[in-house]
Curated annotation (Swiss-Prot):
Keyword terms of this UniProt record: Glycoprotein, Signal
Name under which the protein is recorded: MARCO-like protein
Bridged cysteine pairs (disulfide): none
Region (Disordered), start-end ranges: 47-77, 91-285
Signal peptide: 1-20
Compositional bias annotation for Polar residues: 57-67, 105-114, 134-145, 174-185, 221-285
GO terms for cellular component: endoplasmic reticulum lumen
InterPro entries registered for this protein in UniProt: Collagen_Structural_Proteins
PANTHER family in the cross-refs: COLLAGEN ALPHA-1(XXIII) CHAIN-LIKE ISOFORM X2, SI:CH211-266K2.1
Biased composition (Low complexity): 115-128, 160-173, 186-220
Glycan attachment positions: 24
Length: 285
């Protein structure tokens, strides 16, 4: 009996000793854990302060963050995209930098040098900007009639050139000094007197010009008479002193023949006449 009690006492003593060791180790671990946490916080503070110091040293505009983030530095006259550090996409002066795809689809917002853009007007010229369904026309001295139909493009006329007309789906038009360039048919891109098309150009003292359906542009110089084209064809252009332009319903301009459109051949601003579905016309000397 005494041996059994002694044995139980020994087991109890061993159990208590083991429990005290476990508690001591746990307390020891709890005491050691806060130190690394403090060290980590100090490191984070050091990194944060270092980043602020780096950002304060630079003179440009930076966004400071952890490693792997982007830094943006803007320079005057350049367009910078989001890139990694030391990698910048810089545009040249006077050149249009467009990130990605144009969001303004259907609008002709273009910027460039006079030599590299067909939609930049020079001094003394008349520029036209066409948006879908809208025809905006502006004529300067030296140019005659100008017209375009809904859904057409932008037009540019320089000094001495005459009217320009585009049909839906066609592209831009550009006239040089003393000449007139017209192009564009339904559903096609820019057409400018290529082979296989009906491109007519009249020289001085020449007679009228007529385009059939699907033909491209027509151009007349000083001293030419009326110009006529049937529905489905493109624009007609004359120089100062030519007659007026008239459009029929659903077609482009028609000019210069009886039973089709009116004619007016006096110098000065030519007449403006619109029928349902046709485009407006404006002529100045």
């Amino acid at each position: 009996m005494r041996a059994f009690i002694f044995f139980l006492f020994m087991l109890l003593a061993m159990f208590s000793a083991s429990s005290t060791q476990i508690s001591n180790t746990s307390v020891f671990k709890l005491e050691e854990n806060p130190k690394p946490a403090l060290i980590l916080e100090e490191k984070n503070e050091a990194n944060h302060l270092g980043g602020q110091r780096d950002s304060n040293k630079q003179g440009g505009s930076y966004t400071q963050g952890n490693p792997g983030t982007f830094r943006l530095q803007g320079q005057p006259g350049y367009f910078n995209k989001l890139e990694k550090p030391r990698h910048f996409k810089q545009g040249r002066a006077g050149v249009l930098n467009q990130p990605g795809i144009l969001k303004n689809s259907g609008k002709s917002n273009q910027k460039g040098n006079p030599e590299s853009s067909n939609k930049q007007e020079n001094s003394g010229s008349s520029s036209q900007l066409g948006r879908p369904g809208i025809s905006t026309q502006q004529g300067n001295p030296g140019s005659s009639d100008q017209q375009e139909k809904p859904g057409s493009f932008s037009q540019k006329v320089m000094v001495g050139s005459s009217s320009q007309q585009g049909k839906p789906g066609s592209s831009s038009q550009h006239g040089n000094l003393g000449s007139s360039t017209q192009k564009g048919n339904l559903g096609s891109s820019s057409l400018q007197g290529h082979l296989g098309l009906s491109s007519h150009q009249g020289k001085p003292e020449s007679s009228g010009q007529q385009g059939k359906p699907g033909s491209s542009s027509q151009q007349g110089n000083l001293g030419t008479s009326g110009q006529q084209e049937k529905p489905g064809s493109s624009s007609q252009q004359g120089k100062p002193g030519l007659s007026s332009h008239q459009g029929k319903p659903g077609s482009s301009s028609q000019q210069g023949n009886l039973h089709l459109s009116s004619q007016q051949g006096n110098q000065g601003p030519s007449s403006k006449q619109r029928k349902p579905g046709s485009s407006s016309r404006q002529g100045n000397l």
